[in-house]
């Protein structure tokens, strides 16, 4: 899993990955209140998704290089049981972050292309940014519930219904809730 975002410093790795679900209930509730007041999307902010990877992994490694000018390229590594380690890499990486999940033998199926695409579409189809797998765009439907009613076109309702219902039919009607 890779991005070309701002990357992380060693302090970021310790703060964000050093403690399981570090953000905690209080921060979650504050963010939820902000979301209800028109704030940011909550998907991906509380560590649960990242730490769930240890259910299927022997080891998870995070390779990262921050946008900060003097930042080092780093490797964070953990088996999910005995803490974690952070090391500075000799060879510099490009800015961004790459996560490598080393699967347990019994979860080898999750390395198959068809299975990864199926899981991405099932669980990440509505994230607010494009997802690509081996160069192919895989999340096809935008999260219409995150838009105001006036910003959603009728064909977007149709597409959403067709995706959810697994049909080519159009809905008889629709109602928008916010």
Regions found by a protein language model. Give the residues of each.
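GHKL (Bergerat-fold) ATPase N-terminal catalytic module, capturing the glycine-rich phosphate-binding loop
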Residues: 1-105, 109-110, 118
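GHKL/Bergerat-fold ATPase module in large chromosome/replication-associated machines
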Residues: 42, 60-83, 104-108, 114-178
